[in-house]
């Protein structure tokens, strides 16, 4: 690849006697949407956690956008995640007592932005995801698809280099799932954000540019994906 944003080399990771990763090499191209697939217990979540700097591998290296994450302390990795990485989870993990605007603004406030600037950017991202009329509502008053779009806006408001999406539509019905995936991929492709998408669902993976499959701690394939 001409311009990889993530280069992982020789990753191993064990939890007690269990080898979760057994020497994985992987590159992710800048602006690519990569689907990481695999059965439960295959090591796919451990791989992605290493790529995102959430955990350190036992051996090997991860270079993200020019920074060797494996050479950093936990506090330094946390700073990189705040500034350059976005996360979307299956159940959104929004704060229920905050409005949509406040949820989206939170990462900017944590990074030291003023309340006014953070709210302005939060509202702009809600608008981009078709949620301008939900800005003052709490997550509990929204549909599941709307709440997940708020979570996507929160993940993208800092303009991360890489978005890690862990089963982002796993809790939604098929119609909502397609709507949310379509909205997410539209905005990330416009902004050039790289996406690493963890999924067990082939239809979700079909939205990606490429798929890799993790089995027993090893990569078993890398395939171009054709949207359904």
Segment roles from a protein language model:
Residues 1-12, 220-228:
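ABC-family P-loop ATPase nucleotide-binding domain
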Residues 4-214:
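ABC family nucleotide-binding domain
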Residues 211-223:
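H-loop (His-switch) and adjacent beta-strand-loop-beta switch element
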């Amino acid at each position: 690849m001409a311009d990889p944003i993530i280069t992982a080399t020789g990753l191993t990771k064990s939890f007690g006697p269990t080898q979760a990763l057994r020497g994985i090499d992987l590159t992710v191209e800048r602006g690519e949407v990569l689907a990481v697939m695999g059965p439960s217990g295959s090591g796919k979540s451990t791989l992605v956690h290493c790529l995102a700097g959430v955990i350190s591998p036992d051996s090997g290296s991860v270079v993200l956008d020019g920074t060797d994450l494996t050479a950093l302390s936990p506090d330094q990795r946390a700073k990189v995640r705040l500034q350059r990485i976005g996360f979307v989870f299956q159940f959104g993990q929004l704060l229920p007592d905050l409005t949509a605007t406040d949820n989206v603004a939170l990462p900017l406030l944590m990074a030291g932005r003023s309340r006014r600037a953070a709210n302005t950017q939060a509202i702009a991202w809600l608008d981009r995801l078709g949620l301008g009329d939900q800005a003052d509502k709490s997550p509990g008053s929204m549909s599941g698809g709307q709440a997940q779009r708020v979570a996507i806006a929160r993940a993208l408001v800092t303009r991360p280099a890489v978005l890690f999406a862990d089963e982002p539509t796993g809790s939604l019905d098929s119609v909502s799932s397609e709507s949310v995936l379509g909205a997410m991929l539209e905005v990330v492709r416009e902004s050039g954000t790289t996406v690493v998408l963890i999924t067990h669902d082939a239809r979700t993976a079909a939205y990606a540019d490429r798929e890799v499959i993790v089995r027993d701690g090893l990569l078993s394939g890398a395939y171009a994906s054709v949207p359904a």
